[in-house]
Amino acid sequence: MDKSLLGKLRKETGFGFSKCREALVLARNDYAAAEAWLHEQAEKEGWQKANKLQGRSATEGLIGVIVNHSDMNLGAMVEVNCETDFVARNENFVDLVNTVTSTTLAYRRGIIQRNQKLNMFGDQVTHLREFILTHELSNLRVEHNNPDSMLLSDMVAKVIGKLGENIKLGKAITITTDSDNVIGSYVHGPYVTKVHQCSFGKYGAMVAVKPIKKGIDTSSLALLANKLAQHVVGMNPKVIGQGGEADEKGGESEALLDQEYLLDGSLTVGQFTEKEGVQVVDFVRYECGAK
């Protein structure tokens, strides 16, 4: 057995020493064949483990958020759960959450593009939010245009096979807004990280805003939306509200616009948005493990 191949296989696949050694022995040092065998075994053993572990509590994990402004104003946020903080920090788990989030975004983009071709939205995409149910999420393909691509449920099983904990796909939502608006995002937690365009944390939020005065460039609008998303994570509002209705309650209000602004206590959120010339169109907040 080639020891250099063993080291490379362990590093690139994340599998243990004994599994990688077994793969290389069976494949007679054919690296590609050994890697393929490992992934087949991981999926097979993962489904077996998943069936055994499915009753175990999984309330830890990560929130993943991606916002894309390049071709359309589109954001996706998902929750993926595991049993322990230790696994939530594992590279394989983080990669899984990244894949689930980016797949959710691609799924929504594909629907919008198909509807645009059918002229269902005319020339403009109006503001939409869509909750994706767990069973729908499980049946999404990593490459949504490829019918032979792996299902997200199979990918979850593979990671269960590697990490040995119960892992569950949780909530998922997408927000789409028209070209004049911008979606901002924010994540928070004890180990916030980022992979490619995806940000991860224990808490996450997306906020869609629209300009109500001229002269606000897109980058400034995005910065304002990100600040408002930070407020949403920290203060947990339930509704947007009308603004000016309960200023005396300050931070006690559940209406976003009536809350004391997290980054400037001299203003309510409503006063801040009026001052900056923006209007909150929509927001959504996720907390990992929350009902």
Swiss-Prot record:
Q: What else is known?
A: This protein may be expected to contain an N-terminal transit peptide but none has been predicted.
Described by its record, this protein's role is as follows:
Associates with the EF-Tu.GDP complex and induces the exchange of GDP to GTP. It remains bound to the aminoacyl-tRNA.EF-Tu.GTP complex up to the GTP hydrolysis stage on the ribosome.
Record's keyword annotation contains Mitochondrion: yes
- Mention one GO biological process in which this protein takes part, according to its record: mitochondrial translational elongation
A matching Pfam family: EF_TS
Name a GO CC annotation attached to this entry: mitochondrion
Protein name according to UniProt? Elongation factor Ts, mitochondrial
- Kindly give the PROSITE patterns that the UniProt entry links to this protein: EF_TS_2
The question of whether Transport is a record keyword is answered with no
A Gene Ontology molecular function term for this protein is:
translation elongation factor activity
- Compartment(s) of residence: Mitochondrion
Major location category of this protein: mitochondrion
Which keywords describe this protein according to UniProt? Answer: Elongation factor, Mitochondrion, Protein biosynthesis
